[in-house]
């Protein structure tokens, strides 16, 4: 760098007396970017460095030996129109036409090597005007500067361990030799005589040494491409030699294209993450392309024809290729969406803190969480075990570690009413080994609800107290009403104590003795009366011997004559007006 600074200072002092008038270069000069419909591929290996010219060659009197070297390839002379201004000797940029098909062959099929033709202006000593002399002097100085820059560039690019002959040999070209064009140098605006053909020299940016101080654009692009994943290895293309303003413009354009491509790819990726369309997920399951992103194939340098030489290559993210198994279920689509979201967020470096593991799918929970039964759940996975509907914020019941919605739990596990067979949701009445709605537990006879006295059961049915005793309690033989408390059992019937009396006089039986006639209890008198066993004379029951006469029964001692009152024991008597008479009294009274 110190040598370069010294050379630049020497050049400035040498050319300080020259007019600052701008010099217009021809359409295609060593300091301009080549044009045409060719695809230019620059060679990363630096051109060979020629030996330094002698002092005579620099003064223009003796041709340098390198000037006598001509390439074996074809040469074409492109005549430039003469102009009134001095034209400096230059050569066109060496353009290598790269054919993609030619690169398929072996290296042996490649013909020739890249030719580097160096042009040094010939200074003819002639007694010409001073402007011509100054122009020639300026051209020689520029040529010397170009040579020194090339030498400096070769020293920087070639490792010190390589020999000079290896550094001077260029790599074989993929195709045929490229045509080179030479521009003849005019000595003066008036002579019109073309000087000897100048050898082509590789163009070199005059400000290359200064740019090497700063980080190169290629290194920045390499860092950018390494930070963005690419499906294929990036092809490194060295920047060609051109003038300083055009080189800066090309590298800036390359950086801008690469940066914009990476930005566009990132935007498309973020947009695809925000969409999460089901169609995209189905394509992921079928192995189709989900997203497409544009990645720069190379530096993105435009071709001389104005067309994008590098272009972009579509990079598609594809899922695992699996045979189609029919339309996926909504649950599987949702799981796929959640898994894709989690993986894509992790790839982008977005940290998601899991709030737990879902008790159903066993995956981490990043969004809303439901906590129930000592576990955490995705809201869409906390569903009823029976109907598979989301429980959400509704009430639920737990049985055997499984959640159930309120409706299914009552239908499956709640007790049933014996009357209506419906589930009992609130209060329950348990009776007769059954469960009942409170409003359905009533008397089977009258339909009245049971009060504090309770109910009575008969044949699996519940009855109120009144209906139960009326229907099933024993009845009193006297009043035919139910016997609820104390009772008397007699004559194969239950009796209220107050109802067990003589059926004729309704007198309670003294000492519990009674007489039965036709299934009814009687006192002794009414019993004998009912049976006809009373003495017609004394009106007392006949307990022993009796005499039956005139359809009546008499004690033997009470069967006497109605007039004389003598006992009729002889067995004969006369009857008159339902009264018995002896024979003597009947004759006396009625004869």
Curated annotation (Swiss-Prot):
A motif (LD motif 3) lies at residues 216-228. It comes from the Eukaryota. GO terms for biological process: endothelial cell migration; substrate adhesion-dependent cell spreading; transforming growth factor beta receptor signaling pathway. Keywords: Acetylation, Cell adhesion, Cell junction, Cytoplasm, Cytoskeleton, LIM domain, Metal-binding, Phosphoprotein, Repeat, Zinc. The modification Phosphoserine is found at residues 83, 85, 106, 119, 126, 130, 137, 140, 143, 230, 244, 250, 258, 261, 272, 303, 322, 332, 340, 533. Residues 17-138, 156-213, 237-260, 289-335 are annotated as: Disordered. A motif (LD motif 5) lies at residues 333-345. A motif (LD motif 4) lies at residues 265-276. The modification N-acetylmethionine is found at residue 1. A motif (LD motif 1) lies at residues 3-15. A motif (LD motif 2) lies at residues 144-156. It is found in: Cytoplasm, Cytoskeleton; Cell junction, Focal adhesion; Cytoplasm, Cell cortex. Phosphorylated by MAPK1/ERK2. Phosphorylated on tyrosine residues during integrin-mediated cell adhesion, embryonic development, fibroblast transformation and following stimulation of cells by mitogens. Phosphorylation at Ser-244 by CDK5 reduces its interaction with PTK2/FAK1 in matrix-cell focal adhesions (MCFA) during oligodendrocytes (OLs) differentiation. Phosphorylation at Tyr-31 and Tyr-118 by PTK6 promote the activation of RAC1 via CRK/CrKII, thereby promoting migration and invasion. Phosphorylation at Ser-250 by SLK is required for PXN redistribution and cell motility. Residues 69-101, 121-137 have a biased composition (Polar residues). Residues 356-415, 416-473, 474-533, 534-591 form the LIM zinc-binding domain. The modification Phosphotyrosine is found at residues 31, 88, 118, 181. GO terms for cellular component: cell cortex; cytoskeleton; focal adhesion. Its main location: cytoplasm. Residues 289-300 have a biased composition (Basic and acidic residues). InterPro entries: Paxillin_Lim_dom2, Paxillin_Lim_dom4, Paxillin_TGFB1I1_LIM_dom1, Znf_LIM. Pfam families: LIM (PF00412), Paxillin (PF03535). The modification Phosphothreonine is found at residue 132. Residues 45-54 have a biased composition (Pro residues). Belongs to the paxillin family. Cytoskeletal protein involved in actin-membrane attachment at sites of cell adhesion to the extracellular matrix (focal adhesion). Recruits other proteins such as TRIM15 to focal adhesion. This is Paxillin. The gene is PXN.
């Amino acid at each position: 760098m110190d040598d370069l600074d010294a050379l630049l200072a020497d050049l400035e002092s040498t050319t300080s007396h020259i007019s600052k008038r701008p010099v217009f270069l021809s359409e295609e000069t060593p300091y301009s970017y080549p044009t045409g419909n060719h695809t230019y591929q620059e060679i990363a290996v630096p051109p060979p460095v020629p030996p330094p010219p002698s002092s005579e060659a620099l003064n223009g009197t003796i041709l340098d030996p390198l000037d006598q070297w001509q390439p074996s390839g074809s040469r074409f002379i492109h005549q430039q129109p003469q102009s009134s201004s001095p034209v400096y000797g230059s050569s066109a940029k060496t353009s290598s036409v790269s054919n993609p098909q030619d690169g398929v062959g072996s290296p042996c099929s490649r013909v020739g090597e890249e030719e580097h033709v160096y042009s040094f202006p010939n200074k003819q000593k002639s007694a010409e005007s001073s402007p011509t002399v100054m122009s020639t002097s300026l051209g020689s100085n520029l040529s010397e500067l170009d040579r020194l820059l090339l030498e400096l560039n070769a020293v920087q690019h070639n490792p010190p361990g390589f020999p000079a002959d290896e550094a001077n040999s260029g790599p074989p070209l993929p195709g045929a030799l490229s045509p080179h064009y030479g521009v003849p140098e005019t000595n003066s605006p008036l002579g019109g005589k073309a000087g000897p053909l100048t050898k082509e020299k590789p163009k070199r940016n005059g400000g290359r040494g200064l740019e090497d101080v700063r980080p190169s654009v290629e290194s920045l692009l390499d860092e950018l491409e390494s930070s963005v994943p690419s499906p294929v290895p990036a092809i490194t293309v060295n920047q060609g030699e051109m003038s300083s303003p055009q080189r800066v413009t090309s590298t800036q354009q390359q950086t801008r294209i690469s940066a914009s491509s990476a930005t566009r790819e990132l935007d498309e990726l973020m947009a695809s993450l925000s969409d999460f369309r089901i169609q995209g997920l189905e394509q992921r399951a079928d192995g189709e392309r989900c997203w497409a992103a544009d990645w720069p194939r190379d530096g993105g340098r435009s071709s001389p024809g104005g067309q994008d030489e590098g272009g972009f290559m579509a990079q598609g993210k594809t899922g695992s290729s699996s045979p189609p198994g029919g339309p996926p279920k909504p649950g599987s689509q949702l799981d796929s969406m959640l898994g894709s979201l989690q993986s894509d967020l992790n790839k982008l470096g977005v940290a998601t803190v899991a709030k737990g593991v879902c008790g159903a799918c066993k995956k981490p929970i990043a969004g809303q969480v439901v906590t129930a039964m000592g576990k955490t759940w995705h809201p869409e996975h906390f569903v009823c075990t029976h109907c598979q509907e989301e429980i959400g914020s509704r009430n639920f019941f737990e049985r055997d570690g499984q959640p159930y919605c309120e409706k299914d739990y009552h239908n499956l596990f709640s007790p049933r009413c014996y009357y209506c067979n419906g589930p009992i949701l609130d209060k329950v009445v348990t009776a007769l080994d059954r469960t009942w709605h409170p409003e359905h537990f009533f008397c089977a006879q009258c339909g009245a609800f049971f009060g504090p006295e309770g109910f009575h059961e008969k044949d699996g049915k519940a009855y109120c107290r009144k209906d139960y005793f009326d229907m099933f309690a024993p009845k009193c033989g006297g009043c035919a009403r139910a016997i609820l408390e104390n009772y008397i059992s007699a004559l194969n019937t239950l009796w209220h104590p107050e109802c067990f009396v003589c059926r004729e006089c309704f007198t309670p039986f003294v000492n519990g003795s009674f007489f039965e006639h036709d299934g009814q209890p009687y006192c002794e008198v009414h019993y004998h009366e009912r049976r006809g066993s009373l003495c017609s004379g004394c009106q007392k029951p006949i307990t022993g011997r009796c005499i039956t006469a005139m359809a009546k029964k008499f004690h033997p001692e009470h069967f006497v004559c109605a007039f004389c009152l003598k006992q009729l024991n002889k067995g004969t008597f006369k009857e008159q007006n339902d009264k018995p008479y002896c024979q003597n009294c009947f004759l006396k009274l009625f004869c």
